[in-house]
Amino acid sequence: MLDRQTQIEMLVDHFKRPRHKGLLEGADAVMPGGNPGCGDLVTMHVKADPDGRVEAVSFEGEGCTISQAAASILADRINRTHPTLDEVMDFPYERMIDMLGKDVVGFRERCATLALGTLKMAAKRIQVHRRLREAGRSDQEIRDLERALMDSRNEPGLVFGEAAEEQRGVGGAER
């Protein structure tokens, strides 16, 4: 485990020089996520192979040092380990906080886990879309169903999908 000073230096480094930031050509899912409490926004781009293993991840975002550094650290880890979509879904939020440093994150757990929550939603989107296509659903039917589900399933304190896009420019201080 890293000491507090090393954890802070790691966060600042990832904030100033983010890894895997930008668009991902050919992404299977592009999922925006936001934290209305402080205005953090992260959009995760995910590409997965036909067997459900993550090939690549990138992110776009704006917000506090913790949320943006966490997105960079998470993308870097995923691009090194190439987990399955199920493994992404099972990745514990507590583990993300531990990676960043529990005492460094303090009470900013939503900032620290925004990228992970958004990545999990992207992984779920890929899984659901693939199952629905296998069942013969059209792209329009999938979009309509997804819109209805996203409106009802946002976690308290975090928003995903269209709700995160609507948050852009609302409620957050400039960073």
Spans of features found by a protein language model:
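Short, small-residue alpha-helix embedded
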Residues: 70-78
